[in-house]
């Protein structure tokens, strides 16, 4: 089978899939650093015959896949491009294909993102409400087979990220500065609480 990982990041999911299944995995990213790292890891692990990393936009792809996954990328698509995103997923999927889209979301009605996060952490980022995602999925001709809602799982993830951030405080300050470190410590702590007590969840659409 052929698997596509949209927004493959540092390649961990694509590598795990290639290791555990007899399939060909294509991972795409817009980051030159991530692309270089993924290429290096595929060679180190002797998985070059199964892994194919590309430095490109998902909208430029033009081939068919049995499975499509995307983890942590949809938050960067932008509301006005949701229809285009799912239309492209529909175009790239084989007739009997399955897609899994994993994204942070909100249990509240649609609203503008927090201005502090937009300015300092994720310019252009957006966490959608459920209603904002299901409609473009349907309009793209895809079928929603399952929606899983995860909340507390991600609060634990954020807690670990925050702890790792604090452990590496001096390294981070050397790479950037103390202001950068304090912003990210504040951001991770706030997001941990938003998942634990607030309106933030993780949606997995199949």
Please report, for each region that a protein language model flagged, where it lies by residue:
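Substrate-binding/catalytic lobe of Class I Rossmann-like enzymes that use SAM or dcSAM, i.e.
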Residues: 104-204
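A short glycine-rich, Lys/Arg-flanked "PGG" loop and its adjoining helix->strand segment in the class I
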Residues: 83-95
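Conserved SAM-binding loop of SAM-dependent methyltransferases across substrates and taxa
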Residues: 12-21
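Conserved class I S-adenosyl-L-methionine
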Residues: 1-7
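Conserved beta-strand signature within the Rossmann-like core of class I S-adenosyl-L-methionine
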Residues: 96-104
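Conserved SAM-binding loop
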Residues: 38-39
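Conserved SAM-binding strand-loop segment of SAM-dependent methyltransferases
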Residues: 45-58
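A short acidic, Gly/Pro-enriched loop at the edge of an enzyme's catalytic core
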Residues: 59-68
């Amino acid at each position: 089978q052929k698997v596509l990982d949209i927004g493959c990041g540092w390649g961990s999911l694509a590598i795990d899939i290639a290791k555990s299944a007899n399939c060909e995995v294509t991972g795409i990213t817009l980051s030159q650093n991530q692309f270089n790292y993924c290429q290096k890891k595929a060679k180190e692990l002797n998985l070059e015959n199964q892994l194919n990393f590309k430095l490109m936009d998902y909208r430029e792809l033009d081939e068919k896949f049995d499975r499509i996954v995307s983890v942590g990328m949809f938050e960067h698509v932008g509301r006005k491009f949701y229809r285009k995103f799912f239309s492209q997923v529909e175009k790239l999927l084989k007739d009997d294909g399955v897609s899994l889209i994993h994204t942070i979301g909100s249990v509240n009605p649609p609203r503008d993102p927090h201005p502090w996060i937009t300015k300092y952490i994720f310019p252009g980022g957006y966490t959608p409400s459920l209603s904002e995602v299901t409609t473009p999925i349907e309009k793209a001709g895809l079928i929603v087979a399952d929606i899983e809602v995860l909340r507390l799982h991600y609060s634990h993830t954020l807690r670990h990220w925050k702890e790792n951030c604090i452990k590496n405080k001096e390294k981070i300050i050397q790479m950037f500065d103390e202001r950068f470190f304090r912003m990210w410590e504040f951001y991770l702590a706030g997001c941990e609480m938003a998942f634990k007590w607030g309106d933030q969840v993780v949606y997995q659409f199949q």
